[in-house]
Amino acid sequence: MLKAPFLPIRDLVIFPNVVTPIYVGRANSIATLEKAIANKTKLVLGLQKDASQENPTFDGDIYEVGVIANIVQIIRMPNNNIKVLVEAEDRVKIKNIEKEENEYVTTYTVIKETLKDSKETEAIYRKVFTRFEKYVSMIGKFSSELILNLKKIEDYSNGLDIMASNLNISSEKKQEILEISNVRDRGYRILDEIVAEMEIASLEKTIDDKVKNKMNEAQRAYYLKEKISVMKEELGDFSQDDDVIEIVDRLKNTELPKEVREKLEAEVKKLTKMQPFSAESSVIRNYIEAVLELPWNSETNDVLDLKKASQILERDHYGLKDAKEKVLDYLAVKKLNPSMNGVILCLSGPPGIGKTSLVKSIAESMGRKFVRVSLGGVRDEAEIRGHRRTYVGSMPGKIMKAMKEAGTNNPVMLLDEIDKMSNDFKGDPASAMLEVLDPEQNKNFEDHYIDMPFDLSKVFFVATANDLRNVSAPLRDRMDILQLSSYTEFEKLHIAQKFLLKQAQKENGLANIDIKIPDKVMFKLIDEYTREAGVRNLKREIITICRKLAREVVEKDTKKFNLKPTDLEKYLGKAKFRPEKSRKATGKIGVVNGLAWTAVGGVTLDVQGVDTPGKGEVTLTGTLGNVMKESASVAMTYVKANLKKYPPKDKDFFKDRTIHLHFPEGATPKDGPSAGITITTAIVSVLTNKKVRQDIAMTGEITITGDVLAIGGVREKVIGAHRAGIKEVILPEDNRVDTDEIPDELKSTMKIHFAKTYDDVSKLVFVK
């Protein structure tokens, strides 16, 4: 004997392997169901003989054969009733029903079926299926999927039960079919019922046709309305489920533009006519919720206190003067002109210099919400604009998601790594960003999913990039670009002592511990353990030191630390870089120090040249771009045109020899015209056998007439030279105005020369 909760059912017979909805409203039945749900147990379901009996006594009031069923889903109705989807497993014989407190419990045995797979059973099943198919066609109330699913069923018992459950016959007749355990006999009984129902259906159709022909349009409309009303009443009125009621309340209480409200009201109207379990209902519900969650009219008030804003920016960041000035300028204009639209900035510079954290400080200084949109690796336009609702699993794009997250229509929005977007067959996300960042268009930005204009003109957009060359020209044109440069060692020292060390102490529970890292120790840490444009690795190393110190605090109860240079190896291991020493003026033939500007800051660009047997050509290696190759051709032409100034060591040099120029780190692509004078110097050195000073570096574009033209990234390149231990640099005369950007501490330790022509360069670079 088995035991399970028992639920009496009225006017409904449930067959095995059929998912059936039932409505539970009686107090004892609800208590029984709640216990089964809580204990995750199965239910025994049995039909009441008298449906009008509110409280059955179980003394002959319940049929002896029922089913054991699993609970598939529950829906709590507004009237406190519960709608339950159950799936029956087997026929059971109900033995004894008892009432324990407020719940029904029964003992039962599972009924075994007979003649399940005999030839006669197969024959009667085919006959029943053929008749049932005609019955379905005649009635016209069943979906085509019912017949398709029956064709796939190989278990005759299951198929017969499904057909019986769909017959329009009384509960008593269905109960009689349920009680037949002999599958063959059950088939005969169902066949009899189908034949009888087809005869009745045929007569009803004849009568309906006669009646409908006599009905006028008004009567017909009344008939349909009454029929729909009765159906809704029987089904529990789907339009009033909790989710729909909540959505309607939110729509009433949310301030929305007129056109948005009208569209949502139309969508809600559709939703109320749908069953809550339909796929389309879920799509519409998700859409309405997505639109309601957008900040259509929610706006934060700007804090237009320039003094306070300046204090916040200075508190969190050292340097970055231009970016801070730009924000304060904007706040001043906003104070004078409150109707001013948002700003679109782009902070470009090496990684780790504080671009992202600066944007957070901008948001705080303005009193606005901060939200971040990561664009690195985005290749699909739909990630920006969203997917149209016709697609399965569609959703809003990153911009609308960010606006939802912000909760206001004027946040500070960080568009992180805008240079890392790429395109493929799905579209170009950079083109989609044009509408987002165009002040003339973003007032009516239309996400494909939302499908209504949304005003982005109040958003303060700040994009970040490492290399603007990877950003399309139209996109660059829409942004106010601020070029942020690398930090010098002195700036890194200040940042480390004022910000990074304190932050690392706080993060590692050392805020109350006295930790001192003297400047000379910090310089050693910067020079020998980190080589970067920013301070990201420096922060990481300081955190590592703090973790080691935290361990000493726990193990030895140390309260004070004063680090020495030798302690760095103890906490961080061997130095990762050799300390740069001032390069000597001794020269090498064909080896020249150039300067380059990369996405991670300024670096030295070495050029190595030798002559080999050949026919006066220049061979270039080192993964060079077309512009750099052309610079080499220009340099060679200039040298050949000025052989009187730079006489070759061999008069037949260009007949018998070839110059090979190599740029080390061959796996790294190199391009640009700024290595022109560097290449020229290498060619002249090899040609004349003159040694080139190794304590000097240079940058500048060369022309075939020997003029030295201006280049970009002066500050970065000078910092890179200083980092490499070089004390003298040669810059184009036209870049003299750019030296104001070079930190004063570098100017005081380095000698900067300016050249109008290559003659000025040649006077400085060769060992005399």
Swiss-Prot record:
One of the Pfam families matching this protein, by short name: LON_substr_bdg
Lon proteolytic domain: residues covered: 586-768
Keywords: ATP-binding, Cytoplasm, Hydrolase, Nucleotide-binding, Protease, Serine protease, Stress response
Gene Ontology terms describing biological process: cellular response to heat; protein quality control for misfolded or incompletely synthesized proteins
Amino acids binding ATP: G349, P350, P351, G352, I353, G354, K355, T356
Cellular component GO terms, alphabetical: cytoplasm
EC assignment: 3.4.21.53
Active site: S674, K717
Catalytic activity entry: Hydrolysis of proteins in presence of ATP
InterPro entries for this protein: AAA+_ATPase, ATPase_AAA_core, Lon_bac, Lon_bac/euk-typ, Lon_lid, Lon_proteolytic, Lon_Prtase, Lon_prtase_N
PROSITE patterns, per the entry: LON_N, LON_PROTEOLYTIC, LON_SER
Family matches, as SMART domains: AAA, LON
Lon N-terminal domain sequence ranges: 4-198
Gene Ontology molecular function terms on file: ATP binding; ATP hydrolysis activity; ATP-dependent peptidase activity; sequence-specific DNA binding; serine-type endopeptidase activity
Location(s), subcellular: Cytoplasm
Induction text: By heat shock.
Similarity comment: Belongs to the peptidase S16 family.
Subunit architecture: Homohexamer. Organized in a ring with a central cavity.
Function field: ATP-dependent serine protease that mediates the selective degradation of mutant and abnormal proteins as well as certain short-lived regulatory proteins. Required for cellular homeostasis and for survival from DNA damage and developmental changes induced by stress. Degrades polypeptides processively to yield small peptide fragments that are 5 to 10 amino acids long. Binds to DNA in a double-stranded, site-specific manner.
UniProt cross-references to HAMAP family, sorted A to Z: lon_bact (MF_01973)
Protein name (database record): Lon protease
